């Protein structure tokens, strides 16, 4: 019979079945035992408690302002996009709580979202952060891997399978989730003219996405891949799934500016002259997206539009250190697990940002730069028992042959070490 610290455990502490009846198949800790069946029940109870925030208004649907405040903790800048997303997400889940209908029977259609902005500007992070705050399943799909049914590549239904996996197989929970489709601009039509050759990764994919984005009952192969006639499928209703599509849309700003310059309505000659290419997306219209290569029906399924600005040096410096989950804080805590403090020279932070700007990788490139910079140090530090502090210097950023300093013993008494970390948490813009 199982023992814990000399004490006999005779039965499951939850259902009362004896250890003998269970064939000894119990987990025991601190004198408490649980059988597999009770463990499964507990798991389901926890999942129900943690993953059903939308059952009633009393559960506290966050207001748009509360959602934006949460985004501010994790995402730097992009004020307009934060407001647009916060309102859209709030309205979407308010609609679900009301069962898609208002008191007089008016049916409220869902409003999917299109985000336009350069690589590394925060599109994916915004969607992911909102899903986490709403406590709903979240999945990311890459539009470039999708093809029209019957051709080599992924069927659009595989996007839904990712969401079902994120919901741990709970289809009803997945039906309230959020899907972010990245690189949506890559499925634009190759040109505006009708072609005799089939565009299976462009217009064909847009046509395939129409129904699931608008709302339909889809049949998803449980193992992914292509559907087979005699294979069992998972049925999922996409009516309440929020789709957020994002892409860089390189060249779209020129389309917008050309339209404005040709227009005789709404813009004075001075206003037209003052509209720069990098700000022209403020005036984005549906016709510009159609001109770019999205079909009208697809654009119509994405009625909420917002654009994200290209991040400047000040933005990237803040992204490094300010957000609650900033890259610098992540690495700081990673080193802290080895009882080593990570600090940065102020000039080193600026040099890291300069490199990201030079590579035109935006915020996404900051992590890869830091990973390369700290690679050798992360290899060495766990083997140095007296290591207390790692200092990232400007020279170590600029020169690949120079590693960050590893300080041991009494070397940590240098007064600037503590100040360095304060600087990297509270970066002085001046």
From Swiss-Prot:
Alphabetized UniProt keyword annotations: ATP-binding, Chaperone, Metal-binding, Nucleotide-binding, Zinc
Domain ClpX-type ZB: 1-54
Use of this protein: One of 8 loci used for multilocus sequence typing (MLST) in Borrelia burgdorferi.
Listed GO MF terms: ATP binding; ATP hydrolysis activity; ATP-dependent protein folding chaperone; protein dimerization activity; unfolded protein binding; zinc ion binding
Gene3D superfamilies: 1.10.8.60, P-loop containing nucleotide triphosphate hydrolases
Alphabetical list of CDD domains matching this protein: RecA-like_ClpX
Keyword Protein biosynthesis on entry: no
Binding locations of Zn(2+): 12, 15, 35, 38
Entry similarity comment: Belongs to the ClpX chaperone family.
Subunit note: Component of the ClpX-ClpP complex. Forms a hexameric ring that, in the presence of ATP, binds to fourteen ClpP subunits assembled into a disk-like structure with a central cavity, resembling the structure of eukaryotic proteasomes.
Purpose of the protein: ATP-dependent specificity component of the Clp protease. It directs the protease to specific substrates. Can perform chaperone functions in the absence of ClpP.
The protein, known as: ATP-dependent Clp protease ATP-binding subunit ClpX
Species, as recorded: Borreliella burgdorferi (strain ATCC 35210 / DSM 4680 / CIP 102532 / B31) (Borrelia burgdorferi)
Organism phylogeny: Bacteria, Pseudomonadati, Spirochaetota, Spirochaetia, Spirochaetales
């Amino acid at each position: 019979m199982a023992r814990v610290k000399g004490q006999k455990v005779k039965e499951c502490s939850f259902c009362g079945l004896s250890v003998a009846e269970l064939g000894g198949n119990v987990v025991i800790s601190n004198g408490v035992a649980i059988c597999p069946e009770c463990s499964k029940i507990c798991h389901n109870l926890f999942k129900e408690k943690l993953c059903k925030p939308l059952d009633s208004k009393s559960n506290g649907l966050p207001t748009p302002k509360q959602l934006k405040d949460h985004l501010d903790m994790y995402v730097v800048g992009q004020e307009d996009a934060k407001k647009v997303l916060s309102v859209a997400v709030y309205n979407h889940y308010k609609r679900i709580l009301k069962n898609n209908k208002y008191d007089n029977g008016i049916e409220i259609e869902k409003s999917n979202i299109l985000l336009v902005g350069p690589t590394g500007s925060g599109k994916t992070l915004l969607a992911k952060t909102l899903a986490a705050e709403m406590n709903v399943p979240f999945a990311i799909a890459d539009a470039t891997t999708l093809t029209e049914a019957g051709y080599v590549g992924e069927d659009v239904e595989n996007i839904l399978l990712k969401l079902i996996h994120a919901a741990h197989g709970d289809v009803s929970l997945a039906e309230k989730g959020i899907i972010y489709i990245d690189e949506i601009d890559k499925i634009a039509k190759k040109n505006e003219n009708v072609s005799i050759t089939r565009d299976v990764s462009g217009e064909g994919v847009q046509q395939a996405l129409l129904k699931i984005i608008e709302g339909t009952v889809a049949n998803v192969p449980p193992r992914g891949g292509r559907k087979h006639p005699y294979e069992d499928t998972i049925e999922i209703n996409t009516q309440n799934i929020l789709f957020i599509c994002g892409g860089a849309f390189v060249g779209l700003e020129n389309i917008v500016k050309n339209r404005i310059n040709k227009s005789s309505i709404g813009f004075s000659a001075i206003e037209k002259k003052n509209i720069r290419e990098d700000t022209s997306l403020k005036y984005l219209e549906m016709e510009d997206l159609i001109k770019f290569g999205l079909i009208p029906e697809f654009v119509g399924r994405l009625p909420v539009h917002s654009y994200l600005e290209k991040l400047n040096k000040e933005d990237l410096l803040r992204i490094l250190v300010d957000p609650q989950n900033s890259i610098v804080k992540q690495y700081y805590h990673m080193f802290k697990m080895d009882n080593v403090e990570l600090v940065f020279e102020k000039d080193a932070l600026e040099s890291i940002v300069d490199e990201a700007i030079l590579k035109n990788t935006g915020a996404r490139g900051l992590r890869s730069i830091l990973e390369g910079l700290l690679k050798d140090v992360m290899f060495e530090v766990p083997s140095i028992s007296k290591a207390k502090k790692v200092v990232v210097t400007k020279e170590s950023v600029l020169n690949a042959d120079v590693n960050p300093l590893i300080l041991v013993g009494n070397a940590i008494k240098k007064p600037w070490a503590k100040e360095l970390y304060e600087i990297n948490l509270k970066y002085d813009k001046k």
